[in-house]
């Protein structure tokens, strides 16, 4: 580890921290329906969209109607994207004459982008046409991110409203998320990326002659526009197979820093949105502090492990950090930081190959996802995820002091606790059940690219990434098979909607409750004691479940490596 490396980590943290308050202020005004700087331009468009949809910003929904609207919208998006890939060969904007995508891969990809996972069992530049990339994947990048933001806002309203029956309007929340937050920021980011050298063209791939006289095809396309929402919406699916390790998708250190900040910007700002909407910004800062503790710990372990390198290589006189699978233009520090960021959020974009990390270096991204990606997390998804852990933490605190648990004046009772536990338990169910099944099926084991404990880690990482709606992978696993396309697809659906529905049920229950005034016995939720309780709850409830599986994978791999054994 070097001072320069830690300076880059601190620079990233400083930029994100500086954006939390202004972006949170703007987003709070957007979701409260207040006037913003963009209102003169966007308000007429917003009203026009409501008129076309047959709804109104004054029309609010019960949580069940909110959930039904969300499910219906996502089902339509899945069907449209699936059809687009299946009929890709006869559609326009296909200069490379890409054939139709197979049914299993189309199912997996459609589920992947609808759930904001962006798991990719294909190479974008060798499989998909420009139309599919733009009208299919990029559109879903916007609306899947907006869906997560809408769910988070609905849950926040349940805490902020004194009493009522409705949690908002899904269509209004989604339109505002897209129109006022995602779209303006992405327009700016797209222009910046083009300025930095990222391609943005509808022209065909370029054929170039190499120095040896051979012909080389250079893939280009509408990359910058997809890249902007890919990072800002914590989607992660790359235009190119190499994702953000590709020089056309991440040219230099400046673009790399912008991409890392984009991943965390909205998720971190949601803590400030929460504080503003509940009338106490200290509540939001406390949640951000808990996220920060877990994030810095993860960065420290990953950076240390990668900087220390592989002791087996040191025996050959090759000192230095682990540079396998990393880009020289980023080095160990920025590669380690990017890996922790992309798995702390539900992004999944990579600027280095996680499968080439050391055992402990790869352990941290795995744990980040298994915790439910609540360390900032995906746009919206990370925040409603950590609110589920807050419900459990407050319930435990109430039991310890013998009082009815309360959070922000709302009583946390049996129904809220059951729904929170249900949402949290669906993740290990999807991650571990599919992993266990895959390890005993010869056809699934045949896809493993590495022997020993790392081979098990490849399977565990795949299903963890799918259920956590992350999308990154240990690259040694061949995922484009019928088994993995179907089971990973179901894992993504479970990890997305079996968390969202209980979260909305909690919102529907809490919004009907009257706010109880704070008293001398009320547990303070804006100080260091609450931060410690929340961190402990996340680690114990969210992480302890996976300890046996981790012991068989990365922990065993580290011990084998330390013993000097190869596999």
From Swiss-Prot:
- Organism, as annotated: Agrobacterium fabrum (strain C58 / ATCC 33970) (Agrobacterium tumefaciens (strain C58))
Subcellular localization is given as: Cell inner membrane
Q: What is its main location?
A: membrane
Q: What is this protein called?
A: Potassium-transporting ATPase potassium-binding subunit
Keywords from UniProt, A to Z, are: Cell inner membrane, Cell membrane, Ion transport, Membrane, Potassium, Potassium transport, Transmembrane, Transmembrane helix, Transport
Q: Transmembrane segments in this chain: where?
A: 5-25, 65-85, 136-156, 179-199, 254-274, 285-305, 330-350, 352-372, 375-395, 421-441, 486-506, 529-549
Q: How does it assemble?
A: The system is composed of three essential subunits: KdpA, KdpB and KdpC.
Q: Which family does it belong to?
A: Belongs to the KdpA family.
Q: What terms describe the molecular function in GO for this protein?
A: P-type potassium transmembrane transporter activity; potassium ion binding
Bilayer disposition of the protein: Multi-pass membrane protein
GO CC field: plasma membrane
Keyword Transport: yes or no? Answer: yes
One Pfam family this sequence matches: KdpA
Q: What does this protein do?
A: Part of the high-affinity ATP-driven potassium transport (or Kdp) system, which catalyzes the hydrolysis of ATP coupled with the electrogenic transport of potassium into the cytoplasm. This subunit binds the periplasmic potassium ions and delivers the ions to the membrane domain of KdpB through an intramembrane tunnel.
Give the matching HAMAP family.
KdpA (MF_00275)
């Amino acid at each position: 580890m070097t001072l320069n490396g830690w300076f880059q980590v601190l620079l990233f943290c400083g930029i994100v921290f500086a954006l939390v308050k202004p972006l949170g202020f703007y987003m709070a005004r957007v979701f409260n329906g207040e006037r913003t700087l963009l209102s003169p331009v966007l308000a007429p468009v917003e009203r026009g969209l409501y008129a076309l949809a047959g709804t109104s910003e004054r029309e609010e929904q019960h949580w069940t109607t909110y959930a039904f609207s969300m499910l219906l919208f996502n089902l339509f998006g899945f069907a449209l994207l699936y059809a687009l890939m299946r009929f890709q060969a006869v559609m326009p904007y296909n200069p490379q004459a890409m054939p139709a995508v197979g049914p299993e891969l189309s199912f997996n990809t459609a589920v992947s982008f609808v759930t904001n996972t962006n798991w990719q069992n294909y190479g974008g530049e060798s499989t998909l046409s420009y139309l599919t990339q733009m009208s299919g994947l990029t559109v879903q990048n916007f609306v899947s991110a907006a869906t997560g933001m809408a769910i988070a806002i609905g849950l926040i309203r349940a805490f902020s409203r004194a009493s009522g029956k409705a949690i908002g309007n899904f269509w209004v929340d989604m339109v505002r998320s897209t129109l006022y937050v995602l779209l303006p920021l992405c327009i700016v980011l797209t222009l910046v990326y083009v300025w930095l050298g990222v391609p943005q063209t509808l022209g065909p791939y370029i054929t170039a002659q190499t120095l040896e006289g051979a012909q080389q095809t250079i893939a280009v396309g509408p990359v910058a526009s997809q890249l902007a929402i890919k990072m800002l919406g914590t989607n992660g699916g790359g235009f190119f197979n190499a994702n953000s390790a590709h020089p056309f998708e991440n040219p230099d250190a400046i673009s790399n820093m912008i991409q890392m900040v984009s991943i965390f910007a909205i998720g971190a700002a949601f803590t400030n949105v929460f504080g503003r909407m509940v009338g106490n910004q200290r509540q939001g800062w406390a949640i951000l502090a808990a996220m920060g503790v877990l994030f810095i710990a993860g960065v420290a372990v990953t950076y240390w492990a990668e900087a220390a390198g592989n002791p087996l290589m040191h025996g050959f006189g090759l000192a230095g950090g682990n540079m396998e699978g990393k880009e020289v233009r980023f080095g160990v520090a920025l590669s380690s930081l990017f890996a922790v960021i992309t798995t702390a959020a539900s992004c999944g974009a990579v600027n280095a190959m996680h499968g080439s990390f050391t055992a402990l270096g790869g352990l941290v991204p795995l744990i980040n996802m298994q915790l439910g990606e609540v360390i900032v997390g995906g746009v919206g998804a990370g925040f409603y995820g950590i609110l589920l852990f807050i419900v459990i933490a407050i319930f435990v605190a109430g039991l310890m002091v013998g009082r009815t648990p309360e959070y922000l004046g709302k009583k946390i009772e049996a129904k809220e606790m059951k729904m929170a536990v249900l949402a949290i338990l669906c993740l290990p169910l999807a991650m571990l059940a599919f992993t266990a099944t895959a390890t005993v099926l010869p056809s699934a084991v045949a896809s493993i690219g590495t022997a020993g404990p790392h081979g098990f880690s490849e399977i565990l990482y795949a299903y963890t990434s799918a259920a956590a709606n992350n999308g990154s992978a240990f690259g040694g696993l061949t995922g484009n098979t019928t088994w993995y396309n179907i089971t990973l697809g179901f894992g993504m659906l479970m990890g997305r909607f079996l968390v969202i529905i209980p979260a909305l049920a909690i919102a529907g229950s809490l919004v009907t409750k009257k706010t109880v005034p704070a008293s001398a016995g009320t547990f303070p939720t804006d100080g260091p004691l609450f931060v410690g309780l929340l961190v402990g709850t996340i680690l114990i409830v969210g992480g302890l479940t996976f300890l046996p599986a981790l012991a068989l994978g990365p922990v065993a791999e580290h011990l084998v490596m330390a013993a000097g054994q190869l596999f």
